[in-house]
Amino acid sequence: MSRVPSPPPPAEMSSGPVAESWCYTQIKVVKFSYMWTINNFSFCREEMGEVIKSSTFSSGANDKLKWCLRVNPKGLDEESKDYLSLYLLLVSCPKSEVRAKFKFSILNAKGEETKAMESQRAYRFVQGKDWGFKKFIRRDFLLDEANGLLPDDKLTLFCEVSVVQDSVNISGQNTMNMVKVPECRLSDELGGLWENSRFTDCCLCVAGQEFQAHKAILAARSPVFSAMFEHEMEESKKNRVEIKDVEPDVFKEMMCFIYTGKASNLDKMADDLLAAADKYALERLKVMCEEALCSNLSVENAAEILILADLHSADQLKTQAVDFINYHASDVMETSGWKSMVVSHPHLVAEAYRSLASAQCPFLGPPRKRLKQS
């Protein structure tokens, strides 16, 4: 009977991460063998389909599974009449079923295994069920004395059986010192400073509303704020900054980005937020707005987005808008936005025409390239 091996130490199981707890599953397999010798084999007069059975055998005295070998000396049926058929039969079983693999071979005059055949998987046995090989070996080859498979007219069959038994789980806790590094919460913590107005040292005034902020954070994130506070400007002396041309809700979203690197409402105000990001040199936020606007390009708004991109030097957005217009040229040129742009921004109309004229091949579909973020 196979022995359940001790599991390897958890640290040796893998060169990858080490878990706090582990489980090692061992599938128990009982292996045993059986040898069956048939004397005077050449005198077997059984007809096709007739059977010779061995005595029963098991893995040991306490094993209630009983097996036997079954031979059809002249084959099982018409298809195998020129062969010896060999099967493993489950004679008795206290369980509803068992699974087992098996290997058959013939021992030659030297006691060596020859003509071995093995099951490719563990088969399901129930009591009275057999599995094996209908064409185990050709009769003419077996009976040919030159092949030495019937010394003294004895056929010796050797069978190895592997019976699958229950699985065993061994589990435990890792004894190694585990150091758990907490996730970085810098974004949330800085966002908390903004939301709670703690330890502020400057005031930002937007359309009559006042917002408390931190000069160091503003200066670190925005070159424009940095210039305000670094030089002897009025904003630096009074610690008060007047924010113009930005609506309060857009300003709050911009400040959320400055403190956390996130802008959860960006899709709702991408156009206005693009203008604010451009004004305060927030390059990553600017490209995030460009990407959001690109994903919402349509025939109706293509001209307006092209104007917006040109106004705020949003080069990637501008390229995407021009490409979109080229692809949908006939439809876009019928919109009120395009007709208005012809009057207000003729240079953009010229750029769009130049791009259309220089196109070497038609577009396969509307451009939706992912933008590069700073």
Swiss-Prot record:
Chief location bin: nucleus
Region listing for Required for nuclear localization, in residue ranges: 71-191
Molecular function GO terms recorded: ubiquitin protein ligase binding
UniProt keyword annotations, A-Z: Nucleus, Ubl conjugation pathway
Metabolic or biological pathway: Protein modification; protein ubiquitination
Sequence segments annotated as region (Homodimerization): 297-355
Domain MATH residue range list: 31-161
Matching InterPro entries: BACK_BPM_SPOP, BTB/POZ_dom, MATH/TRAF_dom, SKP1/BTB/POZ_sf, SPOP_C, TRAF-like
GO cellular component: Cul3-RING ubiquitin ligase complex; cytoplasm; nuclear speck; nucleus
Assembly notes: Homodimer. Part of cullin-RING-based BCR (BTB-CUL3-RBX1) E3 ubiquitin-protein ligase complexes that contain CUL3 and SPOP, plus a target protein.
Function: Component of a cullin-RING-based BCR (BTB-CUL3-RBX1) E3 ubiquitin-protein ligase complex that mediates the ubiquitination of target proteins, leading most often to their proteasomal degradation.
Protein name: Speckle-type POZ protein B
Native species: Xenopus laevis
